[in-house]
């Protein structure tokens, strides 16, 4: 029998949980699904997502790390496909969070409050949302 794996979540550590939650809900429609708070207050973990997939983004806030995280050379990202690319672009432009646009490829990237890159991709021919 072949061993199988299913991706279930990605973790981003954040410096301001409330600012991040507001950003992800406004920019990508991701809402809080569940939360775990340490008894001693040392951390809070919030899982966010939407109805289009079971995959979740885990936002982790650590009490002893109030500053933004060093993301190195930022050579990683999480991608989101949208069924209304033009409206998404207009929203992100109004939020001032577009970091890079690749017109030739028909994609762009936004950054969250901690500097994580998020790729925005339109639905392409032959692909489903």
Language model region names:
Residues 61-65, 122-125:
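Acetyl-CoA-dependent GNAT
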Residues 23, 85-91:
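Short amphipathic alpha-helices within nucleic acid-binding modules
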Residues 71-74, 78-86:
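Mid-chain, well-packed structural core segment of small domains
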Residues 2-3, 33-36, 47, 89-129:
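Vicinal oxygen chelate
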Residues 52-57, 115-118:
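Short, charged/polar, Gly/Pro-enriched secondary-structure boundary elements
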Residues 51-55, 64-66, 84-86:
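Short, charged/polar surface micro-motifs in flexible loops or helix N-caps
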Residues 4, 11-54, 109:
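Core segments of cupin and vicinal oxygen chelate
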Residues 1-21, 75-78, 124-129:
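N-terminal beta-strand motif that seeds the catalytic metal site of vicinal oxygen chelate
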């Amino acid at each position: 029998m072949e061993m199988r794996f299913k991706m279930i979540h990605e973790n981003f550590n954040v410096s301001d949980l409330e600012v991040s939650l507001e950003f992800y809900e406004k920019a990508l429609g991701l809402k809080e699904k569940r939360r775990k708070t340490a008894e001693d207050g040392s951390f809070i973990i919030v899982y966010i997502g939407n109805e289009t997939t079971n995959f979740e983004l885990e936002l982790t806030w650590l009490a002893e790390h109030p500053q933004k995280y060093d993301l190195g050379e930022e050579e990683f990202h999480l991608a989101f496909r949208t069924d209304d690319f033009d409206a998404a672009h207009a929203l992100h432009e109004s939020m001032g969070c577009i970091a890079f646009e690749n017109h030739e490829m028909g994609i762009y990237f936004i950054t969250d409050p901690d500097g994580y890159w998020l790729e925005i991709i339109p639905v392409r021919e032959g692909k489903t949302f």
